[in-house]
Amino acid sequence: MKLNRCNPAHLRVTEVALAVFFTLSVPVAVARIVDSRGQSSGGVCEDIYRRYNEDHILCRQPESACQPVASGVEGADKDIILAAHNRYRSQIATGNNSSFPHASNMLEMEWDDDLARVAQAHANLCSNQPSCSSCMRIEKFPHVGRTGCLIRTDSENNTADWEGCIGYMYKESLRIPTTSSNTPLRTMRGVESFTQLAWATTWKVGCGYVKYPSGSALRFEKLYTCAYGPGGNVRGEEVYKVGPACTDCPEGTCCGESCQQYNITPSYSGLCKVVDDGPIFPLDDEDNLLFRCLFNKATSQSCNFQSDPSDGWKTKTFFASTGHAESVLEAGQSAEMTFEQPIKSSHGRLCIEVEYNKGPNVAGTLDRGLFELLVTPVVRPQRQRTINLSGGAINTMRMRITLHYNFDVKIGFSFIVPRGSPAQYVNIHKVLIYEKACPERYRHALD
């Protein structure tokens, strides 16, 4: 590539002893790492996982003391896992056997092999310690959620009890104080497994299982792990929208009678079933939205951009609703991109919202990439303005910036890696431009 140069709670279970639940809440302890050519608990440690976190689940090795007697998720178990998740989600959405408000936008979950690989890699570590979000991140889901449980037992039975494990997750809801029928539910400490199970916009799940000898009084431990995409338990966000079931299903889904046009018979009452290449989620305040680019199929036309050099940026689309623009540069290189569509506000105020990750291409090395927002007047390009966008080496960042222009401008981005620096990357997930001032200018980590 030619580039420019520049200067939980404890409870008794019927199987025998103890069930422990965990979610993504506390950084995991340091484990042994293998290089990109080595074998890990999940197979080959690919370079992209070494980018996300130097302690990524797919780059760890299990302790030598871990000697599984059973592991993996069979086809029949996948059906049980999906049925249990969707049955509980349906109960919440419709208000059947649930003390919570009805959910208007609850998606039906589907199996995902990539998430299952991550979940199995975690289970293979034979450790119930919680792990960080970036430790389980995969390319198509920047934020991956996780739940699971650990059961200690004397039983020789190697069969996984997924119904029991997922049922215990649901029972965490008993700890949530009773609220009115119109009060939105938010994540809270001690019930994160339940709120991830009930997170409306999560629609992919994959799980892993392992049974191994225990160092405790009981002879064996059974470790269950599930990974979710997109992950839930996002601070400040509602678990689901309150309202009659099916009334807020996103584009690309059907629910109830609306599924007849797709010749689909719904399996679960009140759940929005994906009928295409993933749901397309609505954006906030669409009435004031001048420009949207999520680098996905739904916004592909508005995402057209010019890259300098031509191979400095590339786009990747994973589902109808998700994708990103990416630049990976070595020391002394730079690249710019500029959206082709000019933007103008009728009253001179623009709010630009950018969601991104940036950092070293190998986690643990220096974060030296300079990522900037470019605002270029169409008639006076020499008056270009640059705004630094920092952070994001581990977390997905969201920046909102208010601009004041009463003439056409073009929006773009610049990425520069100084000489002597390790390789750096940036992923831009979302660019939204509103015809209004932002509520505030801030930088916010999403996970």
Where are these regions (language model features)?
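Classical eukaryotic N-terminal signal peptides for Sec-dependent ER targeting/secretion
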Residues: M1-L24
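Mature extracellular or exoplasmic CAP/SCP-family domains and secreted bioactive peptides
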Residues: E15, P27-L329, Q333-T338, V362-E372, ...
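Short, conserved beta-strand segments of beta-strand-rich sandwich/propeller modules, principally
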Residues: K204, C351, D408-G412
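Short beta-strands within extracellular/lumenal beta-sheet-rich domains
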Residues: A325-C351, N395-R398
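Solvent-exposed strand-to-loop "edge" motifs in beta-rich extracellular domains
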Residues: P342-K344, E355-N361, I416
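Extracellular carbohydrate recognition and processing domains
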Residues: P377-V409
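Short beta-strand-plus-loop segments that form exposed binding edges in beta-rich domains
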Residues: F413-P422
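Edge beta-strands of jelly-roll/beta-sandwich modules across compartments, strongly enriched
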Residues: A423-K430
